[in-house]
Amino acid sequence: MSRYDLVERLNGTFRQIEQHLAALTDNLQQHSLLIARVFSLPQVTKEAEHAPLDTIEVTQHLGKEAEALALRHYRHLFIQQQSENRSSKAAVRLPGVLCYQVDNATQLDLENQIQRINQLKTTFEQMVTVESGLPSAARFEWVHRHLPGLITLNAYRTLTLINNPATIRFGWANKHIIKNLSRDEVLSQLKKSLASPRSVPPWTREQWQFKLEREYQDIAALPQQARLKIKRPVKVQPISRIWYKGQQKQVQHACPTPIIALINTDNGAGVPDIGGLENYDADNIQHRFKPQAQPLRLIIPRLHLYVAD
């Protein structure tokens, strides 16, 4: 497929996402809103977009106000739709839930509508990340050349739909991206970097090359069977825990956007019990279960690369 054809498909798919989201928000407003609860988080400014989040103050919204915020959030796809001071790199998050009363027919209609939106979003992400054939650093420029101001993460994010929950609870998750590597795999990566000299601010080209050579020597000095691990922290994120009484099971979802809960009164379902979201405080985290951590020694800080002792 030619690059021109891919761009045509990219634009066409995005227009469909916009149209289907507009139709969904109109459709939802035709249904009876049983309960709505969303939690707005402080906006991240451009100056603070890379700063760690030690505290997050939550503001709760209920009822029709919550619904209006949520429906607007689903269609928030461009930086032009937000304050000039807000970071375009930090994700815009609005955890919460909208609960609508449905019957069998309207439940199926909404399920199909949301499934179609999620399919389009997945297709759009596939075009950008796979079909474009571009490295991650070049994708931003390519996408924004054709869709100026697009917040790509908001375009990728699928909608979470649940049916007849008994309880919904919200909380925070601290996670790490973890990847296990062999010594030879790390050496191979460093060789590639050494073969393509460049400057990385604040270092000059020569300083950066020297830094890479030191890193290579440090890794080469390890035993071949050394266990290496990338353990990179991810910014804290809101989550939801859904309890289904009939199935006696709990399901956890990431919750960057409001969940859509359909309550089917034809099947005798009732309004779920919905909890709040507490302010986040990194110094006051309570772990339900924290397994014994493997002893690790940081060896290349910029890569978050550790060696198991």
From Swiss-Prot:
HAMAP family: Rep_term_Tus. One of its GO terms (biological process) is DNA replication termination. It is found in: Cytoplasm. The keyword Oxidoreductase does not apply. The gene is tus. It comes from Salmonella typhimurium (strain LT2 / SGSC1412 / ATCC 700720). Trans-acting protein required for termination of DNA replication. Binds to DNA replication terminator sequences (terA to terF) to prevent the passage of replication forks. The termination efficiency will be affected by the affinity of this protein for the terminator sequence. Pfam families: Ter. Keywords: Cytoplasm, DNA replication, DNA-binding. GO terms for molecular function: DNA binding. This is DNA replication terminus site-binding protein. GO terms for cellular component: cytoplasm. Belongs to the Tus family. The keyword DNA-binding applies.
